[in-house]
Amino acid sequence: MNTATKLLRGGVRAYQLTLSSVLGGQCRFYPSCSAYAMEALAVHGALHGSALAARRILRCHPWNPGGVDPVPPAHHHDEMKQNG
């Protein structure tokens, strides 16, 4: 895991330990958006993991029903690049 990924994961962890506990379980998805971000960063790295996390956070609003939304596997991104 590179330095950028570690820093981003540290930021998410800080959010989990501070604001998340104050705001309560508001996420409409499983896993929660912050847990999704942690996993996306670990699996896909800083750049692609951040993009996946941002996309997830933008979908977390009252007009989206939510539900189960796992982080795509690492090979999924590679296949998308190959298939254009």
UniProtKB/Swiss-Prot annotation:
Recorded GO CC terms: plasma membrane
Membrane topology: Peripheral membrane protein
Localization (cell): Cell inner membrane
Disulfide topology: none
Annotated Pfam families: YidD
Chief place where the protein resides: membrane
Alphabetized UniProt keyword annotations: Cell inner membrane, Cell membrane, Membrane
Function description: Could be involved in insertion of integral membrane proteins into the membrane.
Family as reported in the entry's similarity comment: Belongs to the UPF0161 family.
NCBIfam families xrefs: membrane protein insertion efficiency factor YidD
Name of this chain's protein: Putative membrane protein insertion efficiency factor
Source organism (scientific name): Acidiphilium cryptum (strain JF-5)
